[in-house]
């Protein structure tokens, strides 16, 4: 069927069968053009990009010895997949490492950094907050030093003299690894030989920011890590533009987190959970979307994880909680407990002071914005209360939930919802119901994709709108029907189509690797 006939038939079909054939024809064409565009973009358009060929050596061996543990089977499998990408020299690595909090993504990343150093090149790790970047430096840095590698930390709070020293060491090649925040995107930050870019908590960065860092090392391999890929990232992995490795199990099983969605009438249950945790010597978080009572919906525009409509706008129809008012309210409601607040507008030194006090157990309840979403590790914190839960996206909610239950005691996440009326409330309630039902980050990402759509696959919007008019992504079906991806990339396109759910097959077979499933299959074969 020609394109012109398909357009006529989809509007004026003579039968349901003709309508389905027309939609299949247009879906095929849509997928074909998308795949050609992705291939052209990955090949650098008219500019040839030569991939690096990395080699593993002494730094990696020394780093493995320095680790206080051996990599789990799933971690090792993920590392081997990444190592294969880095060493084959056929293409530039573009890989997503997906794993929930505590699955050991950081240990895998440390091994990858050692491979880049073994190759005589540099690597950069970008984190969304100074807290997380410093955590990398504090935990991973000493291991790199034991492996004979040099590293530095660059954030917005780095003193000018130290910043200049780091710039000079990067340009000379003296530094092997740079940990940093958005500060690494500065034009003054130049590398002698950047061959590896690692981006943690990938959902907190925009497309332009990721591209800007990668541009500092043409041909550099890219590894992005997250617990819940945003819709655009999941769509790219589905279309074969982003190879994916999944680690489903923690090397050391945690106590777990139970999640409940509460309305305002059940607020006493939330306060009761905080009191009970305090009685047992444990701590709690209370998360608010705003910093000050004078803030408005406009102040949410730059807040990561805030839910938006299909046009990317923040819409508010219910009162929003702020940290200042909540601090006063909790001090009245919870007498005898030490309650402090934390937010991104505080000076870096003050933020560090509050976080350190919370880690030492000097603060019982920490009222905060999403600044604690990543990089804050307090095993003694067991209760998380999230105000205006309907205002946050699934990725942010899942990450916030991951701040509790990190020790030997199970955690409790209580999501307060204030939604009334219609509009976007239904989608918000769908998000919260999904959060209650599962703790699987990838399952939540699939739900996020269905609710918020894929955004601009070839552009900069990471969710909202529908780029594809005739193709409907369903990651569950795509990943469960794995054999279709093994067909030759030269065979063209294959679409698994039903009247209302259409799944494309990429021209290039993406390597979506569920390590836990592969291990189970290997175990089953061994038993046989």
Residue spans for each PLM region:
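Upstream accessory/linker segments immediately N-terminal to the RecA-like ATPase cores of bacterial MutS
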Residues: 1-66, 460
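Non-catalytic, well-ordered alpha-helical scaffold segments
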Residues: 4-8, 25-34, 369, 398, ...
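Generic amphipathic alpha-helical segments used as scaffolds and interaction surfaces in large
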Residues: 18-27, 66-69, 127, 131, ...
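Conserved hydrophobic/aromatic pocket- or pore-lining residues that grip, position, or stack substrates
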Residues: 31, 63, 75-78, 82, ...
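Flexible hinge/switch segments at interdomain interfaces of large molecular machines
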Residues: 50-57, 248-251, 407, 457-462
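Conserved pre-motif I regulatory segment
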Residues: 50-98
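Inter-lobe coupling/hinge segments of SF2-like helicase ATPases
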Residues: 88-433, 494-496, 521
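C-terminal accessory region of SF2 helicases/translocases
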Residues: 412, 420-528
């Amino acid at each position: 069927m020609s394109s012109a006939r398909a357009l006529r038939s989809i509007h004026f079909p003579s039968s349901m069968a003709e309508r389905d054939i027309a939609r299949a024809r247009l879906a095929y064409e849509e997928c074909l053009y998308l795949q050609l565009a992705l291939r052209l973009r990955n090949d650098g358009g008219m500019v040839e990009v030569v991939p690096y060929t990395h080699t593993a050596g002494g730094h990696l061996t020394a780093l493995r010895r320095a680790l206080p543990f051996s990599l789990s089977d799933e971690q090792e499998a993920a590392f081997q997949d990444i190592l294969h990408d880095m060493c084959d020299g056929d293409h530039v690595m573009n890989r997503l490492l997906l794993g929930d909090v505590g699955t050991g993504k950081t240990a895998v990343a440390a091994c990858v950094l050692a491979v880049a150093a073994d190759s005589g090149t540099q690597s950069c790790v970008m984190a969304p907050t100074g807290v997380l970047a410093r955590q990398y430096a504090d935990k991973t840095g000493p291991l790199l030093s034991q492996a004979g590698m040099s590293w530095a930390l660059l954030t917005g709070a780095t003193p000018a003299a130290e910043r200049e020293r780091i710039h000079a060491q990067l340009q000379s090649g003296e530094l092997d690894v740079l940990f940093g925040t958005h500060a690494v995107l500065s034009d003054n930050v130049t590398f002698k030989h950047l061959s590896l870019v690692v981006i943690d908590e990938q959902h907190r960065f925009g497309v332009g920011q990721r591209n800007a860092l990668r541009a500092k090392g043409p041909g550099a391999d890219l590894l992005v890590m997250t617990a819940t890929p945003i819709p655009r990232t999941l769509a790219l992995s589905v279309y074969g533009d982003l190879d994916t490795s999944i680690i489903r199990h923690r090397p050391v099983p945690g106590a777990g987190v139970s999640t409940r969605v509460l309305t305002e009438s059940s607020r006493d249950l939330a306060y009761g959970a905080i009191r009970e945790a305090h009685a047992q010597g444990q701590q709690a978080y209370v998360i608010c979307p705003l910093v000050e009572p004078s803030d408005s919906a406009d102040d949410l525009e730059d807040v990561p994880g805030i839910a938006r409509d299909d046009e990317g706008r923040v819409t508010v129809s219910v009162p929003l909680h702020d940290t200042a008012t909540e601090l006063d309210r909790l001090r009245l409601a919870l007498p005898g407990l030490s309650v402090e607040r934390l937010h991104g507008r505080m000076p870096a030194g003050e933020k560090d002071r509050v976080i350190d006090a919370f880690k030492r157990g000097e603060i019982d309840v920490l009222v905060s914005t999403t600044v604690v979403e990543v990089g804050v590790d307090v095993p003694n914190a067991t209760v998380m209360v999230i105000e205006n839960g309907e205002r946050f996206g699934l990725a942010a909610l899942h990450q916030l939930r991951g701040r509790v239950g990190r020790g030997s005691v199970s955690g409790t996440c209580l999501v307060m919802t204030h939604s009334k009326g219609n509009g976007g409330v239904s989608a918000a309630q769908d998000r919260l119901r999904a959060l209650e039902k599962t703790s699987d980050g990838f399952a939540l990402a699939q739900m996020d994709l269905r609710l918020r759509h894929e955004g601009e696959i070839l552009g900069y919007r990471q969710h909202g709108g529908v780029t594809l008019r005739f193709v409907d992504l369903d990651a569950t079906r795509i990943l469960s029907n794995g054999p279709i991806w093994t067909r030759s990339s030269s065979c063209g396109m294959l679409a698994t189509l039903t009247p209302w759910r259409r799944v494309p097959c990429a021209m290039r077979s993406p390597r979506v690797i569920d390590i836990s499933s592969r291990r189970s299959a290997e175990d089953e074969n061994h038993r046989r």
